[in-house]
Curated annotation (Swiss-Prot):
GO terms for molecular function: structural constituent of ribosome. One of its GO terms (biological process) is translation. This is Large ribosomal subunit protein bL27. InterPro entries: Ribosomal_bL27, Ribosomal_bL27_CS. PROSITE patterns: RIBOSOMAL_L27 (PS00831). Belongs to the bacterial ribosomal protein bL27 family. It comes from Rickettsia typhi (strain ATCC VR-144 / Wilmington). Signal peptide: none annotated.
């Protein structure tokens, strides 16, 4: 007689890799056109002045400048402020 009951096979044990979402450039950081500022699912952060919104809701810089995050009416907004030429 077997002393061990037959083990069933588990249907768990898979996991997908992380999607590398989040803020890529922080407040006050220097960016050039095309730099990704935020990677997100949906608009957790809304686009403001001098930034574009990709079809996957990625926010990216349209100009050279500094990143600025602010909150207006419970919406997080990201802008890029142009740097004054000295």
């Amino acid at each position: 007689m077997a002393t061990k009951k037959a083990g069933g096979s588990s249907r768990n044990g898979r996991d997908s890799a992380g999607r590398r979402l989040g803020i890529k450039k922080s407040d006050g950081q220097y960016v050039i056109p095309g730099n990704i500022i935020v990677r997100q699912r949906g608009t957790k952060v809304h686009p403001g002045i001098n930034v574009g919104l990709g079809k996957d809701h990625t926010i990216f810089s349209l100009i050279e400048g500094r990143v600025e995050f602010l909150t207006k009416q419970n919406h997080k907004i990201v802008n890029v402020k142009e740097i004054a030429n000295v």
